[in-house]
Amino acid sequence: MNRWEKELDKYAELAVKVGVNIQPGQTLFVNAPLEAAPLVRKIAKTAYETGAKHVYFEWNDEALTYIKFHHAPEEAFSEYPMLRARAMEELAEQGAAFLSIHAPNPDLLKDVDPKRIATANKTAAQALANYRSAIMADRNCWSLISVPTPAWAQKVFGDLRDEEAIDKLWEAIFRITRIDQDDPIAAWREHNDRLARIVDYLNNKQYKQLVYEAPGPIFTVELVDGHVWHGGAATSQSGVRFNPNIPTEEVFTMPHKDGVNGTVRNTKPLNYNGNVIDGFTLTFKDGQVVDFSAEQGYETLKHLLDTDDGARRLGEVALVPHQSPVSLSNLIFYNTLFDENAACHLALGKAYPTNIENGASLSKEELDRRGVNDSLVHVDFMIGSADLNIDGVTKDGKREPIFRSGNWAFELA
C-alpha cells in the first residue's frame, strides 16, 4: 500500500470537488505525466462517484519530450497536431472541465537551443488559442495541481536520495494544499472566504495605480478603469465555483498595458519550459519592456519577450503575503504554481478578460481600447520579498498602504 494512500484519496477528492468542482453529467479531461497514474486513477474514480459522465485523460512523458527536442527535424517545431487542437476546442464547447497535473523538470531542456523551444511554444499557443481563450475567460471550470517526480524532487531537495526527496516533496505539497488537515475541503472553504474578503476590499477601493517600493527604484503599475480583483475560487460562465490553482494564496487584477514604468528584479527563479531564468531585471517604459538582463537563461528570456508585442507587456499583477504557507516553507520549488504563491508577482503577456468589468463579453478591439494586453503567452514571475512595500493610489491622488514589509497592511474581520 502506498505510504500516502490516505492523503492521495483526499488530494483526489480536493481536485475533483474543489478544483474543477465536477457536476453531474459533466465530462472531465485530465492531462498528466506518467508518474501521476496512481493519482489519476483515484481522480477518475472520485469523478465518476461525483456524477461525471466521462473521464478522458492524456499522458505526457518528459523523456519523449527530451527526445523530440534533440532529434526531431527543425520543421517539426512549426507544426502542431490540429486534431488535438480541435478536440480541446470541442470539449470546451461541450462544457467539459479540465484538470492539469503539472510536474516539471526545471532542467529538462537546458541544453536545447532556446530558438527551438520558442518556436514550439509559439506554434502550440497559436494552435490552442481558442481553447486557451475559453479557459482564461472562465467559460469552463479548470484547475492545476502538481505531483512529485524524481527530477523535480531532486531539484528541490538535492541533498537527498530520490525516494527521500519525493517523500519530502509530497509532505510539502500536502501541507501547502491543506491536505494534512482533518477536513481539507472545509479548510479550503474557509481559505476562499478569507481571500474573498480581501478581493471585496480592493474592488471597493478601485485604486488607479499601485506603487512598489523595495530596495531599488520605485516601480509603478497603472490599473485599467473598471478593473476587477479575483482570488481563490472563481465562477464559470455556467455559475459553478471552482479553484483554478491548488495551491493559491494570491489576489490579482489587470494592469493597463501602457501604464507600467520602472525596473523590477525577480526574487525567485523562473522555470520556463524546461529552462531556469534567474537573476533577471526588466525595465518598463509606458508599459513595454525596453531593457532586460539575466544572469541565467538570458536567451530563453529574450525568446520569451520576442514572442509578440504583448509578451513585452504585463497582463497580470498579483499580491501574495510573504507569510503565506508556501513562503513559510522556505523552499524554492522551481514550479510557478508554487513559487508564485510565495511572493507578489507579475505576469508577462495575455491578461485574463475576467479582470475587467464585462471583459468576457468584449471584443478584442474593445479590450485593446481599454488597455487590456493580448499575447500568445502568459508567464508569471516573482518579485515579492520581506522588504516590499506597496501603496494604492486613489483616484484623487492619495496614497494608502496595501503592503508593509511584505505583508498586508490592513486587517479584515
Swiss-Prot record:
<comment type="function">
    <text>Broad specificity metal-dependent exopeptidase, releasing all N-terminal amino acids.</text>
</comment>
<dbReference type="GO" id="GO:0004177">
    <property type="term" value="F:aminopeptidase activity"/>
</dbReference>
<comment type="subunit">
    <text>Homodimer.</text>
</comment>
<feature type="binding site">
    <location>
        <position position="250"/>
    </location>
    <ligand>
        <name>a divalent metal cation 1</name>
    </ligand>
</feature>
<keyword id="KW-0479">Metal-binding</keyword>
<keyword id="KW-0378">Hydrolase</keyword>
<comment type="similarity">
    <text>Belongs to the peptidase M29 family.</text>
</comment>
<dbReference type="InterPro" id="IPR052170">
    <property type="entry name" value="M29_Exopeptidase"/>
</dbReference>
<dbReference type="GO" id="GO:0008237">
    <property type="term" value="F:metallopeptidase activity"/>
</dbReference>
<feature type="binding site">
    <location>
        <position position="378"/>
    </location>
    <ligand>
        <name>a divalent metal cation 2</name>
    </ligand>
</feature>
<keyword id="KW-0170">Cobalt</keyword>
<keyword id="KW-0031">Aminopeptidase</keyword>
<dbReference type="Pfam" id="PF02073">
    <property type="entry name" value="Peptidase_M29"/>
</dbReference>
<keyword id="KW-0482">Metalloprotease</keyword>
<feature type="binding site">
    <location>
        <position position="345"/>
    </location>
    <ligand>
        <name>a divalent metal cation 1</name>
    </ligand>
</feature>
<feature type="binding site">
    <location>
        <position position="340"/>
    </location>
    <ligand>
        <name>a divalent metal cation 1</name>
    </ligand>
</feature>
<feature type="binding site">
    <location>
        <position position="316"/>
    </location>
    <ligand>
        <name>a divalent metal cation 1</name>
    </ligand>
</feature>
<feature type="binding site">
    <location>
        <position position="340"/>
    </location>
    <ligand>
        <name>a divalent metal cation 2</name>
    </ligand>
</feature>
<protein>
    <recommendedName>
        <fullName>Aminopeptidase 2</fullName>
        <ecNumber>3.4.11.-</ecNumber>
    </recommendedName>
</protein>
<dbReference type="InterPro" id="IPR035097">
    <property type="entry name" value="M29_N-terminal"/>
</dbReference>
<dbReference type="InterPro" id="IPR000787">
    <property type="entry name" value="Peptidase_M29"/>
</dbReference>
<feature type="binding site">
    <location>
        <position position="380"/>
    </location>
    <ligand>
        <name>a divalent metal cation 2</name>
    </ligand>
</feature>
<dbReference type="GO" id="GO:0046872">
    <property type="term" value="F:metal ion binding"/>
</dbReference>
<keyword id="KW-0645">Protease</keyword>
<keyword id="KW-0862">Zinc</keyword>
<dbReference type="GO" id="GO:0006508">
    <property type="term" value="P:proteolysis"/>
</dbReference>
<feature type="binding site">
    <location>
        <position position="316"/>
    </location>
    <ligand>
        <name>a divalent metal cation 2</name>
    </ligand>
</feature>
